[in-house]
Amino acid sequence: LLLTADEWVKHVPACRKTVVGDEPYLLFYSLLRPKRAMGVFNQLKELSKRIGMRVAVLTPMAGNAPNCAELINVLEAGPEEFLSLMRHAQAVLTDSYHGTLFSINFHKTFWVYTEGTKEHELGTRRGQVLQELGLTDRIVTDFTQISSDEVKSGIAIDYSAGADVALQSMRGHSIAYLKKSVAYQEN
């Protein structure tokens, strides 16, 4: 979060173009485990039908995703492709800390999926960031909680209502800490 979205785009030219085509998509970025994958893929297919757009699946298990019209299997993606997928997504669904941070940084409509309870999620790194930014309403425990209207509009979150101010404050504290640490090391 030390870099803004504009700084990421400036320094990583590949994220200026899309890697999955021009049609709108929801990005599903997850650290899926094999035992969970098949049930989640079925839920993603249903979500795709409900929201009227394809779901780009970026996960270690993408190769196991069913070959179907609803899902775009992203089998090879390094950091540049990840940034491109994130930047160009209409919305993001993630269970990943970094997926959460980049969704916030790129001002995406997003949801954080947890298999536990919302209360449990608030105790995780993701949950703590969401609390600090006033975005705990983005936690879902079921894909049916994702609003198709929010996905389609892509503007479900008013970042200017407080999240941006909190993010700037967090960024400022982190940079000050790093500068102090470097100065201490030099002495």
Regions found by a protein language model. Name each.
Residues L1-N187:
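Active-site anion-handling motifs in enzyme catalytic cores
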